[in-house]
């Protein structure tokens, strides 16, 4: 994946790609204006999620921003229907599992508090997603 990203951005030599553990990022405090995560949080067990969110807060000078799945009964039902209709093996197995492993807005808020976010805010968004950010 990194090789593809590098190839696609070859005309932008100022862009760097780094593979790293999200719970121990190799960047200094406040290295970025924002630290953005998309569709990652649901892959983390709660303890790892707290470590991950703590690292995002640490490296973000202004705000960490997390977009992820939002666990609801309707989201799980939709994922099951998609899995039943799909021919793709990954979709069949991953869609319902990802929804089951995702967090509710309240759970995401609590994880962010535990990670030391000063003023976490969670907003439900379309298609059973949520947006979590530190409004501090």
Where do the protein language model's features map onto the residues?
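A conserved beta-strand element that flanks and buttresses the S-adenosyl-L-methionine
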Residues: 36-37
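Conserved short alpha-helix immediately C-terminal to the canonical SAM/SAH-binding motif I
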Residues: 1
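A short, conserved alpha-helix within the catalytic core of class I
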Residues: 44-59, 66
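Conserved SAM-binding loop
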Residues: 5-6
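C-terminal lobe and adjacent flexible extensions of AdoMet/dcAdoMet transferase-like proteins
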Residues: 126, 130-136
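Hydrophobic adenine-recognition pocket in adenosine-nucleotide-binding enzymes
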Residues: 40
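C-terminal alpha-helical "lid/dimerization" subdomain adjacent to the S-adenosyl-L-methionine
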Residues: 69-121
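Conserved SAM-binding strand-loop segment of SAM-dependent methyltransferases
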Residues: 11-28
């Amino acid at each position: 994946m990194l090789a593809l990203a590098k190839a696609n951005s070859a005309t932008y030599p100022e862009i760097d790609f780094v593979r790293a553990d999200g719970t121990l990022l190799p960047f200094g405090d406040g290295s970025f204006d924002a630290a953005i995560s998309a569709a990652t949080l649901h892959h983390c067990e709660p303890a790892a999620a707290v470590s991950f969110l703590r690292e995002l807060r640490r490296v973000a000078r202004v705000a960490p921003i997390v977009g992820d799945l939002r666990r609801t009964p309707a989201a799980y039902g939709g994922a099951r229907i998609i899995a039943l209709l799909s021919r793709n093996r990954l979709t069949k197995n991953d869609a319902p599992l990802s929804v089951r492993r995702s967090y509710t807005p309240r759970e995401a808020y609590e994880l962010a508090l535990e990670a030391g976010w000063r003023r976490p805010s969670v907003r439900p968004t379309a298609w059973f997603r949520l947006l979590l950010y530190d409004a501090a």
